[in-house]
UniProtKB/Swiss-Prot annotation:
It comes from Pseudomonas paraeruginosa (strain DSM 24068 / PA7) (Pseudomonas aeruginosa (strain PA7)). Its main location: cytoplasm. Gene3D superfamilies: D-tyrosyl-tRNA(Tyr) deacylase (3.50.80.10). One of its GO terms (biological process) is D-amino acid catabolic process. Its EC number is 3.1.1.96. It is an enzyme of class 3 (hydrolase). A motif (Gly-cisPro motif, important for rejection of L-amino acids) lies at residues 137-138. This is D-aminoacyl-tRNA deacylase. SUPFAM superfamilies: DTD-like. CDD domains: Dtyr_deacylase. GO terms for molecular function: D-tyrosyl-tRNA(Tyr) deacylase activity; Gly-tRNA(Ala) deacylase activity; Ser(Gly)-tRNA(Ala) hydrolase activity; tRNA binding.
Length: 145
């Protein structure tokens, strides 16, 4: 599983002009599921997302986590993160999980997040989404499980 997290001042996801998920200050996380990923990987990734220290403390150092600042968590599925881009000029998606597995693992991540964190929003799996964000920093990290 790959998770591209971005610290945001605000973010929202629209599908067909309708807002399906939005947060204020927090993390926008694009999630790509790979064939070897399962529930254990989802749990490990959620722990990282909630506890990774990307927010500034009183001295401006990145010492505070999403859980510490009680920020929003916007999870958006993005199978293109799992693409193989090592050769050629066209990405190969054979390294991404099949859609049914990708959806199951992503939904498990969302379910765990909603139990563990008070502010969770999502995009819509498999939909053509427009993601709007106010990038804070910018601060962006690629996490893998």
């Amino acid at each position: 599983m790959k998770a591209l997290l971005q610290r945001v001042g605000a973010a929202r996801v629209e599908v067909g002009g309708e807002i399906v998920g939005s947060i204020d200050r927090g993390l926008l996380v694009l999630v790509g599921v790979e064939p070897e990923d399962g529930e254990r990987c989802a749990a490990k990734m959620l722990h990282k997302l909630l506890n990774y220290r990307v927010f500034g403390d009183a001295e401006g150092k990145m010492n505070r986590s999403l859980a510490d600042v009680q920020g929003g968590l916007l999870l958006v599925s993005q199978f293109t993160l799992a693409a193989n881009t090592r050769s050629g000029l066209r990405p190969s998606f054979s390294s991404a999980a099949p859609p049914a597995q990708g959806e199951a693992v992503f939904e498990h991540l969302v379910k765990l997040a909603r139990v563990a964190h008070p502010q969770v929003a999502t995009g819509r799996f498999g939909a053509d989404m427009q993601v709007h964000l106010v990038n804070d920093g910018p601060v962006t990290f690629l996490l893998e499980c």
